[in-house]
Structure formats: structure tokens, C-alpha cells
Amino acid sequence: MKYDLLVIGAGTAGLSAAIYGVRAGLKTICIEDAVYGGQIVNTPEIVNYPGIPTITGIEFANQLYQQATSLGAQVFYEQIDGLDFGLFPKRVHTTRCEYQADAVIIANGARHRKLGCAGEDAFEGKGVSYCAACDGNFFKSQVVCVVGGGNTALEDALYLSRICREVHLIHRRDTFRASAAVVEQVRQTQNILLHLSCTVSEILGESTVNAIRIADAVGDAGEETIPASGVFIAVGLQPNNTIFDRWVDLDSGGYIVAGEDCKTKTEGLFAAGDTRTKQVRQLVTAAADGAIAATGASQYLYSKNSKK
């Protein structure tokens, strides 16, 4: 099947790209291996998207999907098992068939890295969150935990300290990986309590989280149970871009190297959203990337066709 534009992923960046693609007159398809919407469907309420005071993650995803498909974009749910971006048109092979497209946007996102402890999956969306900026306000004046030792974890702890009564910051090492200025700010914040050289052994609760159990990572101090209403996990993101590494450059974290124009090193191949190198990974930046990448793809195809 032949398309003008093929988008890999149907999250916020992917569906935004599809909207801009079809509005530019491109025959557009999204290939998604899970559910449309991406990570945002796990967020109970979105309160930081400009122009929309409040909306659930599922509602937001539904509206994006309906807007894209009503304009004419197609969304297929298939696993990609091969590709060739060196040809024109480019080829994407799935478990069902081969797709051809003149331009491709990679918008497969990046998944939050999980701890892998007991209770994590059971309480996701019920007290376990991977986004303090998205969900922190649900825990106003309550006790929460943040797990991680990098800039994101410490910045999350600082953000939550202004909302929550008490923040327990848990890190498996005895020193933080965050910048010195952020570490000092955390240490000076009275309602942030540090638990260094500790690992999370279990997240506890009934219908929602009510405690977290941590263990001494280096000695034999045993375990401690901390009563808490929320657990914010910030141990990094995990892109899955090795299938593309022949056609794009990857940074040390596995993200696709692409600038603000979303262009990769391969002609006609773009990267949008959380999958690419960037400083801020939020809903609004993913939507912006999708628009930029699709506009770039449209300009690329116009330029290519005008030379024929």
C-alpha cells in the first residue's frame, strides 16, 4: 500500500503529525503497535495543556484520534518487523503487509522506565505516577514519595514540595546524579526527606496506594514502610529505537538525534515527540513536534515533486 506520509506511532506527536499531514493534502497513515494516545492515556487528568483547563488522558487521546481520522488519516495497529528507508519510496514491513511512503515520521515515543517492584503495575494510575507535572496536584497537602536520583527526580521532588505536605525522596545510591545546584536546593527544602542507598521493594495499598516499603541497598538495616498516598517514579525514559539505527543517529540515551526542525540524517525521515533529543518532554512539545515534522515532510515532498 502506497502513502505520501507514514507516521510510526499514534501518540500525541504521531496524531498531531497525522492531522497536519492530511491538512497539507498528504495521504497519511499511522502505524501503532499498542493503543492510540500513547503514555497520556495513563494520566487521570491533564491540567497543563494550553487552552484546555482540564481533560482526562483518555478523553484527550480520543479527541486527537477522532480529529485525525475524521480528516482522513488512517490508523492501523500492527507490529513493525522490518524497514528500508534508503529507497524511494521508503518501505515499512509489518506482520501484515508492506507499506510504502514518500516521507516517514518516527513518533514512537519513549516509555517511562519502570522500577519492576511489586505493586508498581497494579497501582499505576491509582497512586503510582511517572509525571509529577501531570499528576502532582492530585496529592495536594498529602505525603508522597519520589524515586530516582537524577535531575528529573529532584526537580519533581522540589515541584511536589510546594504542593504536598511531605516528600520522601528515595535513591538507590549515596549520591545524586543531578546538578549541584538542584541537589543543594533539595537539601535546603525542609519538607523533602532523603532516603539514600535505598531501593523500593514494594508499593502497598488497597484500592489506591497507601504506603511504600524500602530496603537498605548496601547494609543490613532491613526494611522501612513509609505511609504515602502517591509514588512518583523518575528513573529515566526508555526509547526503543534500535530498529532505526541504520538510518538515524542515536545519542547515548538511545534517542534519535534531530533538531527543532525534526529532521534526521536521512532525507525524508523525521523524528517527533519524546523519541528525539530534546530538553522538555511534555504533551504540548509532542504536539508541536508533530506539526513541525509534518510541515517539514510536506515541504520536502513539494520540493521533490517540483524537481520532476
Regions found by a protein language model. Name each.
Residues 3-71, 154-180, 251:
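Beta1-alpha1 glycine-rich phosphate/pyrophosphate-binding loop at the start
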Residues 2-4, 77-78, 140-142, 197, ...:
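Phosphate-coordination loops involved in phosphoryl transfer and adenosine-cofactor binding
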Residues 75-138, 149:
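Glycine/small-residue-rich loop that forms an oxyanion/phosphate-binding "nest" at active or ligand-binding sites
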Residues 68-87, 91-93, 98-101, 161-259, ...:
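A Rossmann-like FAD-binding core segment of flavoenzymes
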Residues 116, 122-138, 234-282, 289-292, ...:
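FAD-site-proximal beta/loop scaffold in flavoenzymes
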Residues 11-12, 35, 110-112, 150-152, ...:
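Residue-level detector of alpha-helix initiation sites
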Residues 10, 108-109, 235-236:
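Glycine-rich, N-terminal phosphate-binding loop of Rossmann-like dinucleotide-binding domains
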